[in-house]
Regions:
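C-terminal edge beta-strand
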Residues: 34-46
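N-terminal carbohydrate-binding accessory modules
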Residues: 46-118
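An active-site-proximal structural segment forming one wall of the substrate-binding cleft
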Residues: 53-55, 98-119, 129, 133-163, ...
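Hydrophobic faces of well-ordered beta-strands that scaffold small-molecule active sites
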Residues: 69-75, 119-121, 157-161, 199-203, ...
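Active-site region of glycoside hydrolase catalytic domains
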Residues: 179-325
Length: 325
């Protein structure tokens, strides 16, 4: 008879405890004359008074959250409007400068009622920024008010830095620009640290280095340099957020590929940032076919003529081929 011990593994599952009381049980294991009792305890269910907008779900993957986001819309031409002709005495002057009405709770609720489940809130923080890179409290308050309207509708929100590419592009090589980028993101992180899974951060918008490299000009070394700068920006952003307080340690984040162009997502020169939380997704802007997505119907330019409709067999094939990359 062999004396080699035999190991058996059994998985025992029970229904979740939905009562306010601790549940106890004893599991008895017997093999021949050997009997072993194991006492187990199931914690009581504690109903949290914390609103859902402050909740972080420990086991929620970023992929699952992206699926929750569903159909989204961009709150463009509002908090991201820029221009040296805009009267800086009120944040609402920026909000209306490009033709938008003042954003109201009813507008945000209207998006939700129309079927949108996520809202991107682009912000040009530099509009009201002090010389020592402090965001004006009126702008921060306004962003938070719109954010709360969004979250209270059950929508997912995205906040970024928008329309400030000129100085953001200098961050990898200029210490002052890096200080500015770091300061803005630290303030965003501090202000919104209590918010949960339904708030994502995005570092910037459509950053590219055409002066260094484009698909039509420049060497492979130039391309590596240009894409490398965007990699550096992404990593700096992730590091800032993860080293801040509150729920930011586990916040789901978006990071950018070069020019947010889909084809660079699978370019070997693109590097996903190191993230201890492993909660990252790529943001991609898809303007294909350009004669429909960019040009107006009948508009004529040197590279094409705008069309008013989309949905041909060729259109679907192109879309499906790109999404399968």
């Amino acid at each position: 008879e062999s004396s080699t011990p035999v190991q058996a593994i059994y998985n025992i599952t029970v229904e979740p405890n939905t009562t306010p009381d601790v549940r106890n049980a004893t599991i008895t294991v017997s093999v021949k004359e050997h009997v072993q009792e194991i006492n187990v305890e199931q914690a009581a269910y504690i109903q949290s008074d914390e609103p859902e907008k402050y909740t972080v779900r420990e086991n929620l993957t970023t992929h699952q959250l992206i699926n929750e986001m569903g159909l989204g819309i961009n709150l463009g031409n509002t908090l991201d409007a820029v221009g040296d002709w805009i009267d800086p005495s009120s944040i609402l002057n920026y909000e209306q400068a490009w033709g938008s009405p003042v954003i109201t709770q009813e507008i945000i609720e209207g998006y939700a009622k129309a079927g949108y489940s996520s809202l991107r809130i682009p912000v040009s923080w530099g509009n009201l920024l002090s010389d020592d890179f402090k965001v004006h409290p009126d702008l921060m308050d306004r962003v938070e008010k719109i954010l709360n309207w969004t979250l209270d509708c059950g929508m997912v929100a995205i906040i970024n830095i928008h329309h400030e590419n000129e100085w953001i592009k200098q961050v990898p090589t200029d210490s002052k620009a890096k200080e500015k980028f770091t300061s803005i993101w630290k303030q965003i992180c501090e202000r919104f640290e209590k918010y949960g899974d339904h708030l994502l951060f995005e570092p910037m918008n459509e950053i590219g280095y055409d002066e260094i490299w484009t698909p039509w000009s420049g060497s492979e070394a130039d391309k590596a340099k240009a894409l490398g700068y965007v990699n550096d920006l992404n990593q700096l952003f992730v590091d800032i957020v993860r080293n801040s307080g509150g729920n930011n340690a586990k916040r789901h984040l978006l990071v950018e590929i070069y020019n947010t162009n889909l084809e660079y997502a699978y370019d070997p020169l693109f590097k996903m940032p190191n993230d201890p939380a492993n909660r990252l997704a790529l943001t991609v802007h898809y303007y294909t076919p350009a004669d429909f997505a960019i040009l107006g119907g009948g508009e004529v330019v040197d590279w094409g003529v705008g069309r008013e409709s989309w949905g041909t067999e060729a259109d679907f094939k192109e879309l499906n081929d790109n999404m399968d990359l």
